[in-house]
């Protein structure tokens, strides 16, 4: 290899046969507001392994396990191995969404990073809303994102969408006539429609009227972001997280740390569990509710949604035990999901 070729290889972040898709995945993550430094580091290690050990065809269970063995070196912590495996899994889900590769692995066990999503009670949800509603802007000239937080928190809880999806919504994606929001920037790269109820629609319309008074002409354009800071710029997820933690503090809900939560993503988990309880309360068979919830959350398959059944049993055991836990299908799902990987941001 010539010196020029070596220099070219060193300048490229990814060099394997999946380099183009890795670049696209990183761009997609950044577009959703995620910090990618750690993920890029993990992906480069995966890329080097693939470059040195090209798969014979697609990436399957056997190939993945070979890679996993290569990172399970004595000096590697279980947390580090889990982080790399999570990145690989996210990338493989991206490939599946593109129709490139079908295999999606389960994550390894990680004692250092175990957590169960925090499910807020209905009272805690109302306390969070009241806390963010009562938070005042400290300076008239502040570039704060606070003006969007009350509607964002309600949007996440009402629709169950991911925060990355919410901050990517454009004005043109909101259809008040049909009471829906179109999600173009889905995590799984699948377009989906989120229904909005009457109360959320009223909140959104009130926010838009206030937002359109900002001294910027672009804020109301169809392709401009729906949720903005006072300068008319789109929201940063890290800023959203900070406002959420502040709301937890004001609501008297202890923040126990990043992996212990509660996190902004737990509004999505809570939305699903509360929706499941509502469907059961309205008489829907619990087993039949899973496909409905899968569509609601934008999951590619029902497997990810099944884990909410176990979580609902843990949080609301009386309700679940009273209805359908006696059914063999429900028992099988609860037992299966209790033995699988830990919760992750994929959900």
Regions found by a protein language model. Name each.
Residues 2-347:
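Conserved catalytic core of the tyrosine transesterase superfamily
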